[in-house]
Amino acid sequence: IERMYGEDNEPIMYYITVYNEPVKQPAEPENLDVEGLHKGIYHYNTAESGSLPANILASGVGVYEALRAQEILAEQFDVKASVFSVTSWVNLARDGAARNKEALRKGVEPTEAFATKQLKGFEGPFVGVSDFATDLQEQIRPYVPGDYITLGADGFGFSDTREGARRFFNTDAESIVVAVLEGLAREGKVERSVVEKAARDLKLDDPTATSSTSDVEEQ
């Protein structure tokens, strides 16, 4: 507050994004990537089992859905998913855009975007998900080093339970699972029939067939 409104205030603004949902705060990951946390994205964890690599980028309470999707993918589809916590999609987009602008002005190749740096060592498709519109996740598409599928709450709203709304917008764990399988199908790693069966069995078109993020154990 002092930096924003004090006598020697600076041209900056601090804000807090608050989600209307009670969740357990996960424990701090071992060897936390503090730079990544501050700049917009860090690797949270990778599933212990599975042979097909894939990646889930999630923000806010979407991280819980990503972790639940990670469990389903490992247990039912032999997918070893890495989960990334995105602390700021906008910062990542601004970083990439600033590098592109600097390169244009100098007539040189752009330096590597921070998002690319964080993701380039991970194999498989990438799925980006948040409770906001997909436009938010789409901002970093140029900097994702692989096939990228985005899930978000596009539309005019949906009045129901949190779980029902996430199923309606397809931002819940089950929808993430199918999006990851879709990415793997595009890479030829799984058959199209696997994706179709998963979408059908997980009832992605039924907002009443849902489970809760509260089912996720504290990590």
Regions found by a protein language model. Give the residues of each.
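Thiamine diphosphate
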Residues: I1-Q219
